[in-house]
A protein has these predicted regions:
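Short, surface-exposed recognition loops or helix-turn segments adjacent to catalytic cores
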Residues: 156-167, 184, 260-267
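Extended alpha-helical scaffolds
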Residues: 152-156, 165-170, 180, 194
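Structured core elements
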Residues: 42, 66, 77, 158-160, ...
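Acidic, His- and aromatic-enriched active-site or binding-groove loops in soluble protein domains
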Residues: 63-71, 175-199, 204
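TRNA-binding/sensing appendages of the translation machinery
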Residues: 1-84, 139
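Cap/lid and interdomain-hinge subdomains that line or gate substrate/regulatory clefts
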Residues: 133, 137-138, 160, 167, ...
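Positively charged, Gly/Ser-enriched RNA/tRNA-binding surfaces
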Residues: 18, 24-36, 47-48, 83-96, ...
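Beta-rich nucleic-acid/ligand-interaction surfaces
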Residues: 43-61, 162-172, 266-274, 367
């Protein structure tokens, strides 16, 4: 049996009804980002491998599809994340001194899916703010992220917050290899106490105790006060907890409908984050529907270190979580060569109407569009009448 019609695992066609919903959401989110002052950029899907891996942290290379450029012989990759590309654009092509707000929307490709029911070809929408190190930029990005989920129609959203500086402060002065740090981060995120105890057995007592405490620091805003009592009074730890508390206060005031949570041990999927990180969860999805945070070091790989904060989400995932929007009713029109008919159809389309012309021989066929009106001739005029 031929398999020419089969697609690779976790790769799927997007059919008309879903494609329409994705495109409507894409336009809506880009318009929303523009209302915040964001400028649209469109990085290439294909880029030199070393550029795609710059500043992304350990473990990123395994997600990239790789190939050899037949023109130059260099290694190329299909992007798995757009953020490094936007950092390159900010650092080299725009090269501005002040605040730069950028947004993007395009496909990314993963060698492995992030979850059991996720696509290996997400349609990634994201926003980045460069040039401001203060919490004001973090708050603006989080406001924008929550607005995006609201526009998508998601209900019962929970925003989960953490900070990479907590682990940095706890591990300050402790030399760990990249592999050891990755294993430790994974154990913390999974709250695997047995593995964590094994990995920390040879560390200084104060460091070990703090690492064993981190997995228990999750819950509501009260977790921040508990963390102050139980974690070392390191400057990075104190700054992280103070910033999280400041953000929690502002978010609760502006978005009272959002549940706020904290998981101070979860950093597994935030390889290049340097400060505040956040993720959003919604009813009907076990994994986060949106991730973001601060990554001030990402531009250094391109020769220009700039404060940076942003988020990204997958439009395909969002569309799958909300009820389908009704298709806008259309106007049915006969096919004809008369100039007056063609002008009437054109005028309706210019007014924003969907006009479906019934081709000869197909008058009795149903179409996908819900036509509730038809274009008919009355005397010498073409008029729209209800069906």
């Amino acid at each position: 049996m031929s398999s020419a019609w089969l697609l690779p695992e976790h790769i799927a066609d997007v059919l008309p009804s879903q494609a329409r919903r994705i495109e409507e959401l894409r336009r809506d989110l880009l318009d929303m980002a523009r209302s915040y002052g964001c400028e649209l950029v469109i990085p290439p899907l294909l880029e030199h491998l070393d550029s795609l891996l710059s500043g992304t942290g350990a473990g990123s290379e395994i997600k990239l599809f790789k190939l050899v450029d037949q023109l130059s012989g260099r290694s190329l990759g299909l992007r798995a994340d757009t953020t490094p590309q936007v950092a390159r654009i900010d650092a080299h092509l725009l090269n501005r001194r002040g605040v730069t707000r950028l947004c993007y929307c395009g496909p990314v490709v993963h060698t492995r899916p992030d979850g059991l029911n996720t696509s290996r070809e997400p349609l990634q929408f994201g926003v980045e703010i460069y040039g401001h190190a203060g919490l004001e930029a973090d708050l603006e990005v989080q406001d924008l992220a929550l607005d995006a989920l609201r526009r998508a129609g998601l209900a019962e959203v929970m925003l989960d917050l953490g900070d990479a500086r907590l682990l940095q402060g706890v591990l300050d002065g402790v030399g760990l290899s990249a592999d050891a740090l990755a294993a430790l981060t994974a154990a913390l995120a999974a709250k695997d106490m047995a593995t964590l105890a094994h990995l920390t057995a040879d560390l200084p007592a104060g460091t070990r105790d703090a690492l064993l405490v981190l997995p228990s620091l999750y819950g509501g805003r009260e977790v921040l006060a508990e963390a102050q009592r139980r974690l070392p009074a390191h400057p990075l730890v104190k700054a992280a907890l103070a910033d999280l508390d400041w953000l929690a206060g502002h978010l609760a005031a502006v978005h009272p409908e959002i549940r706020l949570g904290f998981d101070l041990a979860d950093l597994q999927r935030y390889a290049y984050y340097t400060g505040i990180r956040f993720s959003a969860y919604a009813q009907g999805c076990a994994d986060a529907v949106l991730r973001g945070g601060r990554y001030d070091e990402i531009g250094a790989a391109f020769g220009r270190r700039r404060p940076a904060v942003g988020f990204s989400l997958d439009l395909k995932t969002l569309v799958g979580l909300v009820a389908p929007t009704p298709l806008r009713a259309a106007v049915r029109a006969p096919w004809g060569e008369e100039a007056s008919l063609r002008q009437a159809v054109r005028a309706l389309r210019e007014q924003g109407e969907t006009v479906v012309c019934v081709l000869p021989g197909h008058e009795n066929e149903a179409d996908e569009f819900d036509c509730d009106r038809e274009l008919v001739r009355e005397h010498t005029e073409w008029v729209v009448r209800a069906l």
